[in-house]
Amino acid sequence: MTSLLGLAVRLLLFQPTLMFWASQVRQKCHNGTYEISVLMMDNSAYKEPLQNLRDAVEEGLDIVRKRLREAELNVTVNATFIYSDGLIHKSGDCRSSTCEGLDLLREITRDRKMGCVLMGPSCTYSTFQMYLDTELNYPMISAGSFGLSCDYKETLTRILPPARKLMYFLVDFWKVNNAPFKTFSWNSSYVYKNGSEPEDCFWYLNALEAGVSYFSEVLSFKDVLRRSEQFQEILMGRNRKSNVIVMCGTPETFYNVKGDLKVADDTVVILVDLFSNHYFEDDTRAPEYMDNVLVLTLPPEKFIANASVSGRFPSERSDFSLAYLEGTLLFGHMLQTFLENGESVTTPKFARAFRNLTFQGLEGPVTLDDSGDIDNIMCLLYVSLDTRKYKVLMAYDTHKNQTIPVATSPNFIWKNHRLPNDVPGLGPQILMIAVFTLTGIVVVLLLIALLVLRKYRRDHELRQKKWSHIPSENIFPLETNETNHVSLKIDDDRRRDTIQRVRQCKYDKKKVILKDLKHCDGNFSEKQKIELNKLLQSDYYNLTKFYGTVKLDTRIFGVVEYCERGSLREVLNDTISYPDGTFMDWEFKISVLNDIAKGMSYLHSSKIEVHGRLKSTNCVVDSRMVVKITDFGCNSILPPKKDLWTAPEHLRQATISQKGDVYSFSIIAQEIILRKETFYTLSCRDQNEKIFRVENSYGTKPFRPDLFLETADEKELEVYLLVKSCWEEDPEKRPDFKKIESTLAKIFGLFHDQKNESYMDTLIRRLQLYSRNLEHLVEERTQLYKAERDRADHLNFMLLPRLVVKSLKEKGIVEPELYEEVTIYFSDIVGFTTICKYSTPMEVVDMLNDIYKSFDQIVDHHDVYKVETIGDAYVVASGLPMRNGNRHAVDISKMALDILSFMGTFELEHLPGLPVWIRIGVHSGPCAAGVVGIKMPRYCLFGDTVNTASRMESTGLPLRIHMSSSTIAILRRTDCQFLYEVRGETYLKGRGTETTYWLTGMKDQEYNLPTPPTVENQQRLQTEFSDMIVSALQKRQASGVKSRRPTRVASYKKGFLEYMQLNNSDHDSTYF
C-alpha cells in the first residue's frame, strides 16, 4: 500500500513537467535535422546488452541515411541515446519500471533531448504510463510492450508480436477441425502461469488468463495453474477437464516443471517460445520429453514452411536487437515519405501515420496493421519420431488471420497422425451415457414444448393488444387557425428546421407529434413489439404519452403527445420570454430539475428501466410549464448516439444504463443553472474535442463542464454539490433518481423557507412579475415589428413605384393603366462591345456599376421613374405612375442634360484617358403600364412610344440628346426655355422619316456638356473609337497602372449605400 501511494504521489508531481512538453518536443525535428530519442533502460523485456541495442540503431541509421541520399533528400538523421544511470528511481525489472520511465521523460524535457520519435521503452508498464500521461501527439516505437493495455494506442507502434496476435492464433487453431492432423474443434484449455516468467511470457499468459479476453470468451472451460504441483497433477491426472495445456518458455522450462513424470499419450502441451531460433538449426535434436509438445515460434526471415525446418540459417542477432534496427528503418521510411510529399513531421498526422503500411526492413518487407502492430508468420512445430527433429505442423498469417496447414501425415506421438480431442475420454460407461443422453433428449423436448407454448401465448397477447398500428386515416392535419401564428423571430432557422423534422397533427382530438422512426420499415421484430407495448403502458405526469405508430407514405412515425412550449433547450435559449428575473429564478430551476428527476425515477422503476438518450432537447415543456421526458424506449429501433450528454463509460463502450442517465441529468442541470450552451466550459468550445476528452479522461480529475462554486451562496452550493455527485467518473458513486428527488425536495425547502411566504404568496408574486414582463415584451416586439415593416416598405419602394406598392398592400393587385402622354428616355454606351473586348468581365461590371450608381443619384433629383437597366441600356420614364401634366418632358430633358454633363467628366479606371460616349434618345406619347409576373414582379411599359424612344437612341450620335418632334412640341408649351437644334429628316424603323432635334441646353442655366465627336461618318467614328482604346491601353501599360476592382465598401464613405443594403435595426437581445 505504501509503494502504491508513493507511486501515485510521484505521478502527480510529474504531471506539470510532462504537460510542459508542448513547447519543447520539437527541438530536434526541423530545419533538415531529424533525431530519434532512444531510451536505454536496463530493465528491458530481454536481457540484451545495451551496447547491442545501440549498435543496432546505428546500423539502422546508416541504412536510413543511404536511402535518403538515394532519394536525393539532403537531411541529417541522428539518434540520441538516453540512459537511466543516475536516476532516482532505477528499477530492477519491467514490473517496477513506471517511475524509471517517467524519470527518463523528465530528463528529456529538462535537457531538450526530444527528437522526432521516441524509441522505447519495451516494458508494458512504463510504455502504458508514458503514453497515458504525456498527452502529446508524439510517435512512440517499442520493441516489446506486449500487454493488452498497450493495444489500439493511436501513436504507439510495436515491432515485436503483441499478446493480441498470439491470442488470435490460438483461437483460430482451437477452431480448426478439417485439417489432416486435427479433426476436432477444441473448447477447453489449461494455462500454466507461475508469475516468474520473463516479460514476453508474462504478458502472453496474462492475456490468455484475462476473463474478458477473446480467448476466454470462446472457450467453454479454462483454468489457470499457478504451481508446478498443479501442473504435474493435471498432466497425469485422470479427472482433468481438458487434454490441452498452454505454457510459455523454453524446452528446459517445460522439463523443469514436468520433472521426471511420464506424460499421458492424449496430452497436448502448447509451448509458446516465439523468439528462439535454435529449432531451425541442423544440429538441433528434440529430447524425448518434447514428444507431447507443440512449439509456437517465429521462423527466420524468408522461411518457406515444409515438412522439415532443418537446414535454415537463423539470424545472427536476437529478435530484440533486430526490432530496434527495424524500428529505425520504419522511422526512416516515414521521414522519407513525408519529406517527399512536402509535409511536416511535427504534426499529429505524422504521429498517427506509423500504421497500416509496409516498409522495407533489413531482410525483407515488414507489415504493420491498422493498430501499428507488426504482422508475422507464426509456425507451430512438432517432434518427428523418425528424425527427432522439429518439423512444421502448420503456419499462421497474422495479417490475414489465416491458418495454413503444412503437414498432411505428421509422424508424431499421437495416434492415427491426428491430434486428440481436448476433452478426456469417458470410459466404457455405455449405460450411463445412454441414460444421460435419453434424459437430455427428454429435457430438450420439454424445453422446446415450453418455448413453443410461451411464444404462442406471447403472440396471442401481442395480437390482442391495441398498441399496434394506427390507421393513417385517423391522423388529421391541424386546422388553419391552429397552425397560423405570428412570430417575430424571422431569422430563427432552428425553429424552421425543427418543424421539418417533426410533424404536428391531430389524433383522437388531441394534438400530437409524429416522430420519424428512421431505418424502420414497419415490420417490427418481437423485441421491438415488446418495447412498443411497454411504451403504451407507461403513463405518468412527467412522461410524454405514446399512442402508437402510423405509416404515412413509405415512412413509419411514432405518435407522441405534443407539448406547446417546445424543448427545454429552446426555453433556456429564449431569455426574452423566460427571463431570469421571473420564470427562471432559483426556485423555478429547482422545480424543473425536480420534474426531470420524478419522470426519470418513474421510468427507472417501470418496465422500460432505462432511457439511454436523455438530454435537454428530449425534455419538453407543456403549456403549464411542466417538464416532461420524451424520446425514451425503443432502443432497438433508435440506438443511442455519442453526444455531450453521454456518460464516459458509454462513450467508451456503446451501451446504456441507469447510472448513465444520472450522468446525463447532471449535464442538463448545468445547462439549467447557467443557461448557457450544453457542456459549457471556458477551456474548450469544440464539441468533438469535449466528447474526446470526456471519453479519454482518467485519473483523479476527469474533464467536466464548469460550475462556478466560488460565487455560489450556501443554498446554491447544495445544488452544485448534487450536480457534481451525479457526474462522478465511477458510476457506482452516482446517486439514483430516488435519492436525487429527495435531495431536491430538501433544497427547495431551504429556498422557500428563507422568504417567509406561503405558496400562495409565491404564486401571486410570480404571476405579477410575469405580467409585467409580458407588457414589456409586447411593447418591445411591437417596436420591432414596426421597424421590420419600415424596412420591408423601403425595400419595396426601391423595387417598384410607391403608388404600385401601396396598391399591392391595400388591394393585393395592381390594375394596368393607360397613360395619354408620358416621356421615355433611352441611353446606351457607344462602342460597348469594343470596350468589353479589351476589358475583363469584372472590369465591365465595375464600369457599369460606377456609371449607373451616378445615374441613379441624378434620377433621385427629378420627378422620373427608373424603369430598368438592360446591359448597357438605361431606361427612365416620367408621367407615370403619377401623372404630372407637361412636366414629364421637362424633367426628362433636365435629367438628360445632367447625365450628359456627368459623362463629360467620367473616366474609366482601367482605361485611363478614354472618354465614355453615350447616345441618348427621348420621345413622348401614350403608353400602358402595369406589374407583370408574381415572382420578382416588374413594373413594365408597353406601346409604340417605348419602341420609338428606343429608335431615337439607336439613330442618335455620341454625346448627343436626340429628341422627337412630339417631345419638342411639349417643351414649347411650357415656360422652360430649352435650347435645341434641328437635326433634319431621320428615318425611324416602323415609323418612316420624321424631323428630329438635338437638345443642346437650357437658357439661363449653364451645363458643362462634353463636345460631341466631329466625325460624321459612322465607319470613321468606330475606327476613331478603336484607336482611342488602343491608345488608352498603351497609356496604362506605360504608366504601370494595373486594373483593380473597386471595393464595395468605398461607396459607404461617399454617403450612400450599395444596392439593397439597408440600415440594420436588429437588437442584440432578440432573434429579429
Curated annotation (Swiss-Prot):
Q: Which GO terms describe its cellular component?
A: endoplasmic reticulum membrane; plasma membrane
Molecular function terms, GO-annotated = ATP binding; GTP binding; guanylate cyclase activity; peptide receptor activity; protein kinase activity; toxic substance binding
Task: Answer whether the UniProt record assigns the keyword Lipid biosynthesis to this protein.
Answer: no
The secretion signal range is 1-22
Q: Which family does the entry's similarity section mention? A: Belongs to the adenylyl cyclase class-4/guanylyl cyclase family.
What residue stretches are annotated with the Protein kinase domain?
488-748
UniProt function note: Guanylyl cyclase that catalyzes synthesis of cyclic GMP (cGMP) from GTP. Receptor for the E.coli heat-stable enterotoxin; E.coli enterotoxin markedly stimulates the accumulation of cGMP in mammalian cells expressing GUCY2C.
One BP annotation, GO: cGMP biosynthetic process
Catalysis performed (reactions): GTP = 3',5'-cyclic GMP + diphosphate
For side Cytoplasmic, which residue ranges? 454-1072
Looking at the record, the residues that make up the Guanylate cyclase domain are: 823-953
User: What organism does the record attribute this protein to?
Assistant: Rattus norvegicus
PANTHER family, A to Z: GUANYLYL CYCLASE, GUANYLYL CYCLASE C
Q: What's this protein's name? A: Guanylyl cyclase C
InterPro entries for the chain: A/G_cyclase (IPR001054), A/G_cyclase_CS (IPR018297), ANF_lig-bd_rcpt (IPR001828), Cyclic_nucleotide_synthase (IPR050401), Kinase-like_dom_sf (IPR011009), Nucleotide_cyclase (IPR029787), Peripla_BP_I (IPR028082), Prot_kinase_dom (IPR000719)
The text the record gives for the protein's domains is: The protein kinase domain is predicted to be catalytically inactive.
> What lineage is this protein's organism placed in?
Eukaryota, Metazoa, Chordata, Craniata, Vertebrata
Domain of life (superkingdom): Eukaryota
Instruction: Give TM regions.
Output: 430-453
Keyword Oxidoreductase appears in the UniProt entry: no
